[in-house]
A protein has these predicted regions:
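Solvent-exposed interaction patches of small proteins and small membrane subunits
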Residues: 1, 21-23, 61-64, 102
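N-terminal first-folded block
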Residues: 2-51
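A short acidic, often aromatic-flanked loop/helix-cap motif at beta-alpha or helix-coil junctions
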Residues: 33-35, 81-83, 113-114
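Acidic, metal-binding active-site segment of PIN/NYN-like and related structure-specific nucleases
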Residues: 46-63
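Mid-chain, well-packed structural core segment of small domains
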Residues: 60-93
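Charged phosphate-binding loop/patch that engages nucleotide di/tri-phosphates or the phosphate backbone
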Residues: 96-117
Length: 117
């Protein structure tokens, strides 16, 4: 079963949504200190076979994080509470539809999600 690692920039509402969908979830703060670098977050996710969930668009750069190099990354494109709620609707749909996250980058906004393998 897929398990998720929530970046510290992501709201607790997102944590609850993923957990309520039946998936194991950890926050980066459960594992290490506040202010962990992107590199530290990435290494932890890979070593523990976790899918990263973040608002950090840097994780969407396939030159730095090629899809085949990770267990999965979900980048949420939310800019305020309203857009976050819309992203949650799309994220909930993604979690119901998708079964394979390894090696895939998902970009989630308030209207749709895109995936790159």
């Amino acid at each position: 079963m897929a398990a998720f690692l929530i970046d510290e920039c992501v709201s607790f509402q997102t944590y609850r949504l993923i957990s309520a969908s039946g998936f194991p979830v950890k926050t980066i703060l459960d594992i290490t200190h506040s202010g962990a670098t992107d590199s530290e977050l990435f290494k932890i996710a890979q070593s523990q076979t976790l899918i990263i969930v973040t608002l950090d668009s840097g994780f969407g750069d396939v030159r730095i994080y090629p899809p085949k190099s990770h267990n999965g990354i979900i980048v949420l494109k939310a800019f305020d509470l309203n857009s976050l709620q819309k992203c949650h609707t799309v994220l909930e749909m993604l979690l119901k539809i998708e079964s394979e996250f390894k090696g895939t980058l998902f970009i989630v906004d308030g209207n749709k999600y895109r995936k790159k393998k």
